[in-house]
Amino acid sequence: GNTKIRKVVDNGANRIITDYAGNGNWGDRDGSALAEAELGNLRNIVVDSNDNLYVTAEQRIRKISADGSTVSTIAGQWSDFADGYGTNAKFRTPEGLAIDAEDNIYVSDRENNRIRKISELTSPNGAKVETISGSGEYDYQDGTFDQAAYRDPIAVIYGAGALYVVDRDDNRIRKVQISPKMTIPAGQTSVTYNIKSINDIVYETDEIIEFSSNLVVGGILASTDPISLILKSDELIPN
């Protein structure tokens, strides 16, 4: 292919197409967008709230600055699996990309059979990469984030606090709930939950406490008495 990002401008009479990033060579070099940057094996693209572009290319997640001047690598280095920051993180054929309102990026990591989350995009150590779903086994299995299994997840889209994954070899669309909620029933002042199974809890919007990492961030309770919340595991769910 041309290994380039192209820009299309519709002026009403014509569509004007120009090169935006990539010098046409197959590779992984960062640098000035048109003269130096190499964008081999381009797959997908998303745009953040500041108009920066992010693409999957050559086992990496690459960023094209909003002004179109530079290309940099925010995560990934070579084909493998590892969570971490910047180039310490590794992917195997990152394919689909999605982005939420807080500029967290989600990646369907095909050959690792996992769904990855990229956050802290401006960190000096590189963006943070963590696995939010998938055991890595080539299999079909529903369950909590480290129990679920995929067979070749090739695309992902974000909507209303959930990810929807095209699980190609399973011929299914899978849902990953990334904003879990816990319910304290009306009139009840004590509740016990196992963090590992929180995704399976049915909830209603008028009686919820949202749990993100180790922080209870809100809730509207039917009871006016003090609430006791007991968690049975110290293993944290992903953000």
Language model regions located:
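Short loop/turn segments immediately following beta-strands, especially the blade-tip
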Residues: 8-13, 65, 118-124, 178
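Blade-level signature of beta-propeller repeat domains, shared across WD40, Kelch, NHL, RCC1
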Residues: 152-179
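Residue-level detector of Asp-centered blade-edge/turn motifs that repeat once per structural unit
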Residues: 47-50, 99-102, 158-161
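Short boundary segments that mark the start of a structured unit
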Residues: 177-239
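Short loop/turn segments immediately following the C-termini of beta-strands
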Residues: 1, 10, 58, 110, ...
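Conserved beta-propeller blade signature
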Residues: 52-55, 104-107, 162-165
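Structural signal for beta-propeller blades
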Residues: 2-6, 61-62, 113-116, 171-174
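Gly/Pro-rich loop segments of beta-rich domains
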Residues: 12-41, 68-95, 123-154
